Design a protein with these regions (language model features):
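Short, charged/polar surface micro-motifs in flexible loops or helix N-caps
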Residues: 23-27, 70-71, 95
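Glycine-rich, flexible loop/turn motifs
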Residues: 7, 64, 75, 102-106, ...
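Small-aliphatic-rich amphipathic alpha-helix that forms the alpha element of a beta-alpha
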Residues: 18, 33-76
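A glycine-rich helix N-cap at a beta->alpha junction
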Residues: 8-14, 78-100
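Short, well-ordered secondary-structure micro-motifs
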Residues: 1-2, 29-31, 75, 98-102
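Glycine/small-residue-rich phosphate/adenosyl-binding loop
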Residues: 1-47
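C-terminal helix-cap and adjacent tail motif
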Residues: 88-121
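Generic structural "secondary-structure junction" signal
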Residues: 12-13, 48, 81, 108-112
Length: 121
């Protein structure tokens, strides 16, 4: 799987790798043409992010993988052709504990009513 994910070899050390799949055909049945390309990706991405939060809360390390050879991942996992591989999520016990990265100040990323107007709490 690490080779299929552009040689991101840490994937091979993960205890488990979750593949998020979507069904583009399902969206065609439910939505008009302007929205069809969204839900088959959006719903699995929401689920993956919830898994990231849950795993982190439990002390596991995760890394959302979006760079991969979809055909190769589908071959390895025997995913039906009609489904799309949206993301990979390796989960495991981290082998390091780096300090948190610096974050932008709240006022630089949250705005009130229009971009550039800081949200005051």
């Amino acid at each position: 799987m690490a080779v299929a994910a552009n040689n991101q070899y840490f994937i091979a050390d993960a205890d488990v790798v979750i593949a998020a799949l979507g069904d583009p055909g399902e969206a065609r049945l439910r939505l008009d043409a302007s929205l069809r390309r969204i839900p088959h990706k959006q719903d699995p991405m929401i689920a993956i992010e919830h898994m990231v939060l849950a795993a982190t809360t439990l002390g596991y390390g995760t890394c959302w993988i979006g760079a991969f050879d979809e055909r190769e991942v589908k071959r390895i996992l025997k995913v039906p052709e009609r489904l799309a591989v949206i993301a990979l999520l390796p989960v495991g016990v981290p082998d390091e504990n780096p300090p948190p990265k610096p974050r932008k100040p709240f006022k630089e990323i949250f705005f009130r009513e229009s971009y550039g107007t800081p949200l005051e709490l």
